[in-house]
């Protein structure tokens, strides 16, 4: 199995984290941000864009950009309130009362689980890129007050994204893991989690590696988006009063209002007043209209007074369920971006009478806790025991439509509990078990999780048969219900998945479609990368050509310039016409030309470096004799590319050898590229060649008829006079090597022959010069 990550799938933003070296690390996305907007869109080409790219095109493409879908997961259309339906895109219902999101661009309906799966896949891909290995498993967080249907919908989203969901963990519990991982002492902490779409509050006892949830409460339809909506309504009403136009009826204007409201809410957390300017928000017969106004913090708090009151109720309930008073709370941990609002912080201070702990990042702490839970499951984190609870009560429908609770809310999980039921009529052979979740007394007011029948019960009077019903909740909060007839031993069970709304066939179909989108994304990314690399190659080629021209002159690069310009034009034309085959061919040719250019430049620099370092060596050693390997090994023509000129090899001891100043003979089959012929060589070494002194010396005796030509002067000789081509007699007139201005290094010594002069009588008189 691959790497397991922790994912905070949020209403507004999502975060992914992983355990590395025993510590949780938040992974930044491709845009460099540690949080990824929970936004999915389809642009005008029908391509999928997720995260920040999806958010950027929301104003111009509101009907094909989907946000806040977490609120719709695991719910029926009839469960939605009018406010929750007020989004810029289209929400519709199918024939089974399921929620569908309409995408006009693709002419297709998506389930909320599919949209969330696209976000999860994006996060998993970012984690795979960071880790260098495929991510196959995940621990995903959900609001603590999510019911079983919403939890199962989250698992379905992970499955559609191609992930194995190892654990579903409550967001406040994950936050407590991140906060209390390094806490040694036992503390009672209250986690206040106000996200974009949901609100949760939990009380936990943390210490000695044990995280025990005492109670949890919340509101799955209350979050930061509701505060944004108050600003949207305020702006729309103000504009309606002034211009007689309701901006909420225009999808594009509504999207702009929503973004401006969120920005204003964020700014009011740090300043007392904010400006809201939306030019050209709409147009009437009188022309374009603009929205310009100011919103103060006090006005904002007045707009949201009832929302703050709604925040108080779950806090009171959770303290009551935990059996604690506010003064018994040791720490308050704030989670979610909504907790940055001063009115929310003020509520916590007044209610708990304690300053909130702000040592954790409210946007990242949940994902960090999920990563820790992933480390626990993976064996990387040890000595941690997490005891979570059920957020809502589980029970059965009994006679009269009353709900019988088997598992009260805040029951520690995993848990198994059984109870005995009987028939309601005489000779009843079939019992229908209706599983419910909720806190209301009547079954019709609670959430129906599923139904199943137990048949084969022997006929008997009413109340005689005994049917044992067992509720089994695993660590993920997923419920399995089993009914067993104690008389016959017949048994029937159900794993509550009908609550996920999606059938197994629908989930499999969505998995295949998600894989198709992933393949399209890969192809699109590869195509974009290819186009970007081709354009970058043209810029690189032109830049390199300019550098080489400055170093070696335009004559050196004339043939390369023609090739580079032609191929760059070919690449740009191929990009414009979207001709990939032609683009690949031109790109490969340009890479070849650049390779040859860089190779030729490298050879020229090698020649220069060899001459430079050899000169330094001669300066310090005084060795200017004719065994100079640098010139004896001057390379022959290196390859066909260098112009086909043959310089030959030179023998300083053979006067019949071709002179270096002779024009080289062209070689058959000359290759491409600029010619490095005599003209170029003579340019490079002109001054040096003219300064050399030709000295003809006897070579191994006059009888051989040879001469010795080293063509170079000794640095000790005084050649200031104009007669620089004078031939010196080898034995009598050769200048002394040691006579530097009359004072040799070792005193006045007889003139010595050069190091490479022919041996006299088999002995070199200069062998002991430096010993």
From Swiss-Prot:
Sequence segments annotated as region (Disordered): 624-771
Per the record, the domain of life is: Bacteria
Q: Which Gene3D superfamilies match?
A: 3.30.420.40, Actin, Chain A, domain 4, Substrate Binding Domain Of DNAk, Chain A, domain 1
Q: Name one GO molecular function term.
A: unfolded protein binding
User: Which stretches are tagged as biased composition: Basic and acidic residues?
Assistant: 630-652, 708-734
Annotated keywords: ATP-binding, Chaperone, Nucleotide-binding, Phosphoprotein, Stress response
Please give the biological process terms from Gene Ontology that the record holds: chaperone cofactor-dependent protein refolding; protein refolding
Q: Which sequence ranges are marked TM in the entry?
A: none
Name the PROSITE patterns for this protein: HSP70_1, HSP70_2
- Modified positions (Phosphothreonine) are 198
UniProt key word ATP-binding:
yes
Q: What induces it?
A: By stress conditions e.g. heat shock.
Give the InterPro entries listed for this entry: ATPase_NBD, Chaperone_DnaK, Heat_shock_70_CS, HSP70_peptide-bd_sf, Hsp_70_fam
Q: State the HAMAP family in the record.
A: DnaK
Family note: Belongs to the heat shock protein 70 family.
Name the job this protein performs: Acts as a chaperone.
Q: What is this protein called?
A: Chaperone protein dnaK3
Q: Which organism is it from?
A: Synechocystis sp. (strain ATCC 27184 / PCC 6803 / Kazusa)
């Amino acid at each position: 199995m691959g790497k397991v990550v922790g994912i905070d799938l949020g209403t507004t933003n999502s975060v992914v984290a992983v355990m590395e070296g025993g510590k949780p690390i938040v992974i930044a996305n491709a845009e460099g941000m540690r949080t990824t907007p929970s936004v999915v869109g389809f642009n005008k080409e029908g391509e999928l864009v997720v995260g920040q790219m999806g958010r950027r095109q929301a104003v111009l493409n509101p009907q094909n950009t989907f946000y806040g879908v977490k609120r719709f997961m695991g719910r029926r259309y009839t469960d939605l309130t009018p406010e929750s339906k007020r989004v810029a895109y289209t929400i519709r219902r199918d024939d089974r009362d399921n929620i569908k999101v309409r995408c006009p661009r693709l002419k297709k309906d998506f389930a909320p689980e599919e949209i969330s799966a696209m976000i999860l896949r994006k996060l998993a891909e970012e984690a795979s890129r960071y880790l260098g290995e495929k991510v196959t498993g995940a621990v995903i967080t959900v609001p603590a007050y999510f019911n079983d249907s919403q939890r199962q919908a989250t698992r379905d989203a992970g499955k559609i994204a191609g992930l194995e969901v190892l654990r579903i963990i409550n967001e406040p519990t994950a936050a407590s893991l991140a906060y209390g991982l390094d806490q040694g002492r036992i503390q009672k902490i209250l986690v206040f989690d106000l996200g974009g779409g949901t609100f949760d509050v939990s009380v936990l006892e943390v210490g000695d590696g044990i995280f025990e949830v005492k109670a949890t409460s919340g509101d799955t339809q209350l979050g930061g988006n509701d505060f944004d909506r108050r600003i949207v309504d305020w702006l729309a009403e103000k504009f309606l009063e002034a211009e007689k136009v309701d901006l909420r009826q225009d999808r594009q204007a509504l999207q702009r209002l929503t973004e401006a409201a969120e920005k204003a809410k964020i700014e009011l957390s740090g300043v007392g007043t904010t400006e809201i300017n939306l030019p050209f928000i709409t147009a009437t017969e009188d022309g374009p209209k603009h929205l310009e106004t100011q919103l103060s913090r006090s006005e904002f708090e007045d707009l949201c007074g009832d929302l703050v009151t709604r925040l108080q109720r779950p806090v009171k309930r959770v303290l009551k369920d935990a059996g604690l008073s506010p003064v018994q709370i040791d720490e308050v941990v704030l989670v979610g971006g909504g907790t940055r609002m001063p009115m929310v912080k003020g509520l916590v201070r007044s209610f708990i009478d304690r300053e909130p702990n702000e040592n954790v990042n409210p946007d990242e702490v949940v994902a960090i806790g999920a990563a820790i839970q992933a480390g626990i499951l993976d064996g990387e984190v040890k000595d941690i025991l997490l005891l979570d609870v059920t957020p809502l009560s589980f029970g059965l429908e009994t006679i009269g439509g009353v709900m019988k609770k088997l598992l009260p809310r805040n029951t520690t999980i995993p848990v198994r509990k059984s109870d005995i039921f009987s028939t309601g009529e005489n000779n009843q052979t079939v019992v229908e078990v209706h599983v419910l979740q909720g806190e209301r007394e009547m079954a019709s007011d609670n959430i129906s999780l599923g139904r199943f029948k137990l048949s084969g019960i022997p006929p008997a009077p009413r109340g005689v048969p005994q049917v044992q019903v067992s509720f089994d909740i695993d660590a993920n909060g997923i419920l399995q219900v089993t009914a067993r007839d104690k008389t016959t031993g017949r048994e029937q069970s159900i794993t509550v998945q009908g609550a996920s709304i999606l059938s197994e066939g629908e989930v499999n179909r969505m998995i295949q479609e998600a894989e198709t989108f992933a393949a399209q994304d890969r192809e699109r990314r590869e195509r974009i990368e290819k186009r970007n690399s081709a354009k970058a190659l043209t810029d690189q080629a032109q830049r390199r050509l300019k550098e080489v021209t400055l170093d070696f002159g335009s004559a050196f690069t004339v043939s390369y310039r023609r090739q580079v310009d032609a191929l760059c034009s070919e690449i740009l034309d191929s990009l414009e016409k979207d001709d990939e085959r032609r683009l690949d061919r031109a790109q490969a040719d340009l890479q070849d030309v650049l390779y040859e250019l860089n190779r030729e430049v490298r050879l020229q620099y090698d020649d220069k470096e060899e001459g430079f370092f050899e000169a330094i060596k001669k300066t310090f050693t005084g060795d200017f004799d004719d065994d100079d390997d640098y010139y004896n090994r001057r390379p022959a023509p290196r390859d066909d590319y260098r112009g086909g000129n043959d310089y030959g090899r030179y023998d300083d001891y053979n006067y019949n050898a071709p002179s270096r100043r002779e024009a080289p003979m062209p070689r058959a089959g000359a290759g491409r590229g600029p010619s490095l012929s005599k003209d170029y060589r003579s340019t490079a070494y002109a001054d040096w060649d003219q300064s050399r002194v030709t000295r003809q010396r006897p070579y191994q005796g006059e009888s051989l008829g040879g001469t010795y030509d080293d063509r170079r002067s000794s640095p000790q000789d005084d050649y200031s006079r104009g007669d620089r081509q004078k031939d010196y007699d080898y034995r009598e007139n050769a200048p002394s090597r040691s006579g530097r201005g009359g004072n040799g290094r070792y005193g006045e010594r007889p003139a010595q022959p050069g190091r490479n002069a022919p041996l006299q009588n088999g002995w070199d008189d200069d062998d002991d010069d430096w010993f």
